[in-house]
Amino acid sequence: MEAALLLAKLPEAYQIFDPLVDVLPIIPLFFLALAFVWQAAVGFK
């Protein structure tokens, strides 16, 4: 458990990117939603 917590924490040099790293896993979901909206716009052809 401690090893996973240690790996999950970014090194101090990269602390400024911490909020960005929290958001990055969500980006593929936006692409999935975009594909759905695009298909809805063209009528699911």
From Swiss-Prot:
Key words, A-Z: Membrane, Photosynthesis, Photosystem II, Reaction center, Thylakoid, Transmembrane, Transmembrane helix
Please give, as recorded in its UniProt entry, the membrane topology of this protein: Single-pass membrane protein
The root-end lineage is: Bacteria, Bacillati, Cyanobacteriota, Cyanophyceae, Oscillatoriophycideae
Source species: Rippkaea orientalis (strain PCC 8801 / RF-1) (Cyanothece sp. (strain PCC 8801))
Q: How does it assemble?
A: PSII is composed of 1 copy each of membrane proteins PsbA, PsbB, PsbC, PsbD, PsbE, PsbF, PsbH, PsbI, PsbJ, PsbK, PsbL, PsbM, PsbT, PsbX, PsbY, PsbZ, Psb30/Ycf12, peripheral proteins PsbO, CyanoQ (PsbQ), PsbU, PsbV and a large number of cofactors. It forms dimeric complexes.
Q: Which InterPro entries match?
A: PSII_PsbK, PSII_PsbK_sf
Q: Does the keyword Thylakoid apply?
A: yes
Q: Which residues are part of the propeptide segment?
A: 1-8
- Predominant subcellular localization, coarse grouping: membrane
Listed SUPFAM superfamilies: Photosystem II reaction center protein K, PsbK
One Gene Ontology BP term is: photosynthesis
Provide the protein name. Photosystem II reaction center protein K
A GO term from the CC aspect:
photosystem II reaction center
Q: Spell out where the chain crosses the membrane.
A: 24-44
Q: Where in the cell is it found?
A: Cellular thylakoid membrane
Question: rRNA-binding: is it a keyword of this entry?
Answer: no
Tell me which family the UniProt entry assigns to this protein. Belongs to the PsbK family.
Q: What does this protein do?
A: One of the components of the core complex of photosystem II (PSII). PSII is a light-driven water:plastoquinone oxidoreductase that uses light energy to abstract electrons from H(2)O, generating O(2) and a proton gradient subsequently used for ATP formation. It consists of a core antenna complex that captures photons, and an electron transfer chain that converts photonic excitation into a charge separation.
